[in-house]
């Protein structure tokens, strides 16, 4: 056995974080929400205390551009706001040229203000690709069940058992059952049973790669079986075994890209092409994945307009992105303590031997990707940000945290 690999490649979507408002447990069946609420109330063990900005109720979350500016879009003709653009250029002066960013202040939804820095530069998206997966699942649901009540029933009542698609993923997810003395964080295991809401929650809150692969497979199965979903285990097994790999790959890609392109997202600028786990990738061969800040920002704009599938889906996805536990990376900036943050992050680091340098998580010396996508609601200001970077040997988590504070101060200082 080698004591050291010549390089280490690690896909890290996130350290533990949670999403969806705490009052959503009864409607969704996301059991860990009950556990976290009981921790907050001091009724079960746990030291987790949420920041002020993480305590919104479900009815306080809404879409800011829906009905207020439905036609707005970001493209090469979008003017840069002079104040914000100067501020962004000042923030990034002297920083690594791998940084790229797109920023939109929608505090006045009728008059969005835009700034950017190399917004068209594409990088591997890492776990930001899970935004494509959640779009794919909600799109498949809408096509098979136009009724919102029917979609809610499918999300809540469909129980999916973890299978070999979960391997390998070292991340943990929060497990809570009624009557438990505590919420337990552990890896997803074969035979674990969660409803679709819970699988989505694990994918977007814990950024579980196991959940990401399981959810993507469900989107494929809904596309294949329609109203006959969920298929019996034997039918699912036969489908994955007997369909040619090229057809499976095409179906997997179409399951994500159909609702994305319907929303106006450019697949040449935002694509998830490969599953998150090794076993899933072996079962369904993939293709290239990429993203750029400009298209990620457009995804956020479409979300706020209610155009990611439809208004109901957009609002539910936004709730799933709501950050409701002690924060990390971009969202952990002290400047955002009181802000509501809807957040997804992704990272990928790669190490190679280098005398005198200790390579590790967030500090890769061959690759050190860190990406952040956020909707920030801070006082009277509301803004959308997509940022990507590849700063070698720097603690990229701390860097994004620092930049988040600088952007928050820029937004708050804007006249008007």
Annotate each language-model stretch with its function.
Residues 1-4:
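Positively charged n-region of N-terminal signal peptides that target proteins for export
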Residues 6-14:
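Bacterial N-terminal signal peptides
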Residues 17-84, 274-416:
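Structured C-terminal helix/loop/strand segments within mature extracytoplasmic catalytic/sensor domains
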Residues 65-91, 150-297, 302:
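Active-site-adjacent helix/loop patches that line small-molecule binding or acyl-intermediate pockets
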Residues 93, 134-146, 204-209, 216-224, ...:
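Sec-exported extracytoplasmic/periplasmic mature domains
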Residues 93-123:
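Short, conserved catalytic-motif segment at the N-terminal edge
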Residues 98-104, 145-162, 211-217, 226-228, ...:
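Surface-exposed patches in mature extracellular/periplasmic domains of secreted proteins
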Residues 125-152, 160, 296, 385:
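Active-site SXXK
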């Amino acid at each position: 056995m080698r004591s050291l690999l010549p390089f280490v490649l690690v896909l890290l979507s996130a350290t533990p974080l949670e999403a969806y408002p705490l009052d959503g447990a009864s409607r969704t069946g996301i059991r860990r929400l009950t556990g976290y609420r009981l921790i907050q109330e001091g009724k079960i063990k746990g030291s987790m205390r949420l920041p002020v900005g993480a305590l919104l109720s479900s009815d306080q979350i809404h879409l800011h551009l829906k009905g207020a500016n439905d036609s707005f879009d970001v493209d090469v003709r979008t003017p840069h706001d002079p104040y914000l653009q100067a501020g962004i250029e000042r923030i990034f002066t002297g920083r690594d040229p791998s940084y790229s960013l797109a920023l939109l202040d929608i505090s006045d939804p009728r008059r969005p203000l835009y700034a950017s820095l190399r917004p068209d530069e594409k990088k591997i998206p890492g776990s930001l690709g899970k935004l494509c997966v959640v779009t794919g699942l909600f799109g498949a649901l809408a096509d098979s069940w136009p009724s919102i009540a029917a979609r809610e029933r499918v999300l809540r009542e469909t129980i999916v058992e973890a299978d070999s698609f979960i391997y390998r993923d070292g991340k943990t997810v929060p497990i809570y059952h009624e009557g438990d003395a505590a919420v337990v964080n552990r890896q997803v295991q074969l035979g674990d049973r969660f409803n679709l809401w819970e699988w989505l929650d694990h994918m977007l809150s814990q950024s579980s790669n196991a959940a990401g692969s399981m959810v993507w497979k469900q989107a494929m199965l809904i596309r294949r079986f329609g109203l006959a979903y969920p298929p019996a285990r034997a039918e699912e097994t036969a489908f994955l075994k007997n369909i040619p790999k090229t057809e499976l790959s095409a179906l997997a890609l179409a399951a994500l890209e159909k609702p994305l392109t319907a929303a106006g997202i450019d697949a040449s600028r935002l694509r998830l092409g490969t599953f998150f786990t090794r076993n899933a990738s072996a079962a369904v061969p993939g293709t290239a994945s990429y993203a750029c800040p400009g298209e990620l920002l457009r995804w956020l704009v479409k979300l706020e307009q209610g155009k990611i599938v439809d208004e109901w889906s957009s609002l539910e996805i936004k709730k799933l992105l709501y950050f409701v536990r002690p924060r990390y990376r971009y969202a952990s900036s002290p400047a955002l303590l009181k802000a509501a943050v809807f957040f997804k992050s992704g990272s990928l680091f790669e190490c190679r031997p280098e005398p005198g340098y200790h390579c590790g998580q967030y500090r890769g010396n061959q690759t050190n990707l860190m990406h952040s996508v956020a909707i920030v609601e801070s006082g009277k200001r509301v803004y959308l940000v997509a940022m990507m970077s590849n700063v070698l040997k720097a603690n990229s988590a701390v860097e994004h945290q620092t930049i988040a504070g600088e952007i928050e101060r820029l937004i708050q200082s804007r006249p008007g």
